[in-house]
From Swiss-Prot:
Subunit-level organization: NDH-1 is composed of 14 different subunits. Subunits NuoB, C, D, E, F, and G constitute the peripheral sector of the complex.
Protein name from the UniProt record: NADH-quinone oxidoreductase subunit B
Annotated membrane topology: Peripheral membrane protein
Gene Ontology cellular component annotations, sorted alphabetically: plasma membrane; respiratory chain complex I
Function: NDH-1 shuttles electrons from NADH, via FMN and iron-sulfur (Fe-S) centers, to quinones in the respiratory chain. Couples the redox reaction to proton translocation (for every two electrons transferred, four hydrogen ions are translocated across the cytoplasmic membrane), and thus conserves the redox energy in a proton gradient.
Name of the gene: nuoB
One MF term in the entry's GO annotations: NADH:ubiquinone reductase (non-electrogenic) activity
Amino acid sequence: MGVIQTLDRLMTNPMPEGRVEDILRPEGENPLLEKGYVTTSVDALLNWARTGSMWPMTFGLACCAVEMMHAGAARLDLDRYGVVFRPSPRQSDVMIVAGTLVNKMAPALRKVYDQMPDPKWVISMGSCANGGGYYHYSYSVVRGCDRIVPVDIYVPGCPPTAEALVYGILQLQKKIWRTQTIAR
C-alpha cells in the first residue's frame, strides 16, 4: 500500500476511533434527530469548529518551508481540511515552525506567538525546528523551538515530506478533539 493510500485511509475522519457524537449518528439511531433536534455538548461543537477551520501562520525559516508550500498545493490540498494559510498572526490559531531557528530569530518567533489569539497551537516541522538538526552544535542555533514556544506536534524529517506535515495536522486535529474548553 502506497503513501497516498495510507493517508487517504487516515484522513477520512479526525474523530478518534470508537468515539461517536450524537450529530454523527445515522438517522435511525438518533431519535432526537428524527424529531428535528440536534444535541451535542458545547465542547464538542467548539472543537468541531476548531478542527474544521485551522488557520496556520507560516514561520518558514529554511528548506522545510518548501515542503509546507507543497502540502498546500494541488496534490494534497490542505484547503479540503479547512486549513488555510494566513499571513498575519492575529488571524491564525496554528503556527507551523519550519526550519532552523537561530538565536537572532528567537525573539521574533516569541513575539509572533504572543500576537496569536487563544487558543493557539504550534507544529514544529523538521529536524532543525525539533532539535537543531544538522546545525545542532552551532553557536547560533536554538536547539529546538520548544525552548521558545510550547510545541504541540513534532513532525520529524530532514526535510519532512508534505504527507508527513498533513499527518501532523491530522494529529493536531485529533488533539483538539480531545481538549475540554469549558471547565467542569
